[in-house]
UniProtKB/Swiss-Prot annotation:
UniProt protein name: Cytochrome b6-f complex subunit 6
Family: Belongs to the PetL family.
Subunit architecture: The 4 large subunits of the cytochrome b6-f complex are cytochrome b6, subunit IV (17 kDa polypeptide, PetD), cytochrome f and the Rieske protein, while the 4 small subunits are PetG, PetL, PetM and PetN. The complex functions as a dimer.
Membrane topology per record: Single-pass membrane protein
GO molecular function: electron transporter, transferring electrons within cytochrome b6/f complex of photosystem II activity
Lineage of producing organism: Eukaryota, Viridiplantae, Streptophyta, Embryophyta, Tracheophyta
Matching HAMAP family: Cytb6_f_PetL (MF_00433)
Keywords of the record: Electron transport, Membrane, Photosynthesis, Plastid, Thylakoid, Transmembrane, Transmembrane helix, Transport
Spans traversing the lipid bilayer: 4-24
Record localization: Plastid thylakoid membrane
InterPro entries: Cyt_b6/f_cplx_su6
Amino acid sequence: MLTITSYFGFLVAAFTITSALFIGLNKIRLI
């Protein structure tokens, strides 16, 4: 149970970091 929760949290963190980097790159390209 704990391993599944930690793995899900890791996926959420990775997704948020990648999405943030992608949005940042798009903003830099727009400038």
